[in-house]
């Protein structure tokens, strides 16, 4: 196996594909594979099942989200806007 101190999770690609592509893949995959917080039980046990399908290993909740993160930046923005509208009323 190749050394992966600098390249991390993308060490499996070896000398192929170039630095820029591997850097973006590394950023996406590290963010995808970390533990995310469950919206139901608020514990960091959410793992990706498939593209856009996420499951909490603690409470068993299955929900949809982004392909690489359970809550996309647009979803966060929409939730914030809804909260602001409800506060104003």
Swiss-Prot record:
Q: Does the keyword Ribonucleoprotein apply?
A: yes
Question: What is one term from the GO cellular component aspect held by the record?
Answer: ribosome
MF terms from GO for this chain are: large ribosomal subunit rRNA binding; structural constituent of ribosome; zinc ion binding
Cofactor descriptive note: Binds 1 zinc ion per subunit.
The protein's UniProt keywords, in alphabetical order, are: Metal-binding, Ribonucleoprotein, Ribosomal protein, RNA-binding, Zinc, Zinc-finger
Zinc-finger (C4-type) residue ranges come to 38-59
Biological processes annotated in GO: translation
Could you say which cofactors this protein requires? Answer: Zn(2+)
Note the HAMAP family from the entry: Ribosomal_eL43
Provide the family line. Belongs to the eukaryotic ribosomal protein eL43 family.
Name of the featured protein = Large ribosomal subunit protein eL43
Q: What phylogenetic lineage does the species belong to?
A: Archaea, Methanobacteriati, Methanobacteriota, Methanomada group, Methanobacteria
Q: State the gene name recorded for this protein.
A: rpl37ae
